[in-house]
Structure formats: structure tokens, C-alpha cells
């Protein structure tokens, strides 16, 4: 089975020395030493040299749970880039987080459920007690796992056994690196709902293991990386109904404020839609998602002035046309206001305003004078040609 590498800094060597029998002093990877985990268990390992007083201990994958479990039980831990409270440099650390990433990668790609369970239920919580930045260091790495060849069963298992606070980087990683089916989303949302019920109603999940998902980020990742608008709509509906599936009267009193925050966190309202439409434009996402969002927004008054300005001035006309077709067409007064204040728009946008009924006979001369005063030559020429043709 695969060999795994873990930190063997001098501070760890000192802690482990009392448990090592038959030690290989030459640091020859081909020569093994023995580590006595307990009276009934000994594992073989070898070591290789590094710099700055650290090296690596090399063990077989099958011994990983026993070895890491022993470190956890004995509270022997390398603090990523920190040893004895001192930094040893960004390019000279022991690569501890990379080692843990490799361990999880081997576990997941080989479908080793026992090791996946150990990682999420034992190792990751332990690391959090020693390094507050572990979510940043390992979160990205764990998300990247989904770009590898991983079975659907392994993916489901990770969501099934992970803590609520791990759901965010798991879910976003999945959305970023895989095209996923509605069936898999159904499984994930069902798993999430069960975990929330265990926390709020059954009080079986501690507060420290709970974190809400970033609803906007999940929707943005769905827009950026998934192809189906039906999938986006399903995700929106599922999150919007999460709180409705838990009766507030059944929620433990000590969690009711947190429950109320949950209901607010997953509201699909004009604020989040405005944000997502802006995201679509700047990331140049598929226009079919922008189309859905404009229909969900509906009323023109729900669009912030800043968003309208972005839609009208962005270089990609596809979003502007959708906005006109789905929303602005029903607001002739707003079309005239935009036309009268269209000095900063491209002529294509001004032409679209005219196409959708801007009263250029009434407002064209005023706009033309202002365009000439501001030296907007292209707009002035467009308006002169427009009014010359129609007069």
C-alpha cells in the first residue's frame, strides 16, 4: 500500500523517542524502526532527513490510523509552520498540511471509509484545536479533491460523516470541480437537513461543530460551474425550505437564536439576487442563469441603481438585452429616464433604448445638446442621424 509522510521535527522526535524501539539512526529510508503504540501494537516506520531540524517519518497507509491516533492520544502535534512557538519560514516548513491532504487523497480515491471517517471525525477536529487557520490551509486542498477520480459513493460518504462546519468547503469544492446531478444534490441536502435536525431538535451535535453555509457562494459556484438552470433552481428551493422543514417549537430553547439566524441566512431575496446578477456580469457566466435571475427579481424597483448602471455600461450586450426583454420593457418611464441620462452608455445601448420605446422626439434634442457639450462625438452623431432619419 502507499507510503505516507508526516512531520518528524526534533520536538516530535523527542516526544516519540521513548516509544521507539530498534531505531534506525542512519535515517535510511530502506531501514525500518519500530514504534510501540501500545503493549499490543507495534508499527514499522522509516525516516528521511530534512532541514531546520525536521525530517519526515514514513509509514504505510494501513498504519495511518494507529499512528495518527497515537499522536492525538499523546497530544503530540506539529503546528504546521510553527514549532515551539517559532516560525521556521514559509518555504522551510514541514509541509504538515500537505501531508494530511495526501492522506485524505489516498483514503478517498481508494474508497477507504474507515480512514475517511477517521480524518473527518478525529483528525480534523484535533487539528482545529491546535491551529485556528486549519480551515484555510486544508479547506482548499479538500475542495480540490473533487477534481480527482473519486467515486460517487466516496463523495456521499464524506458528506454523510463530516461535521456541519465541513459542509461549506465540501459543497463548494464539489460545485467547483464537478458537474453534478440533481440526484447527488438531493442526497447532500438530505444529509445536511438531518444534521441540522440533530443539532437544533435532538441536541446531538455540539455548537462548536456547527457553521452555516455561505448561501451566496454556493449559488455563485453553481452559476459558474454547473450547466443546468434546473439545478440552480433546485438548490435555491432546497435552501429556502431548510428552516421550514424544522418546526421552531421543536427547536431547543438554547438554539432558537441560532435557528432564527439560519432562516435569515438562507433567504433568497432581492439582496442576494442583485449580488448574483452582478457576479454573473463580472464573471461573464452563462446568460441563461442571468435570465433566470432577472425573472426571479421581477419588479424594476428591486434592482439597485448600481446594478442597473452595471447592466447598462458593461461591454457585454447579452446581459443588457435580457434585462430589457424581461424587465425594462414594462417600464416606459424608466426607459425614458435612462435615455435622457445615457451619456455614459455605448451607442448600442442607446439604440436598444430607442428600440424599446425611448421617446427621442421628446428627449432627443436635450440629450444631443448635452452630448455635444460633453464632447460625446459618437453619441451626438448617432442622435443626429436618428432624428434626421425620422424627421
UniProtKB/Swiss-Prot annotation:
It comes from the Viruses. Belongs to the mimivirus L17x/L18x family. This is Uncharacterized protein L172. It comes from Acanthamoeba polyphaga mimivirus. The lineage of its organism: Viruses, Varidnaviria, Bamfordvirae, Nucleocytoviricota, Megaviricetes.
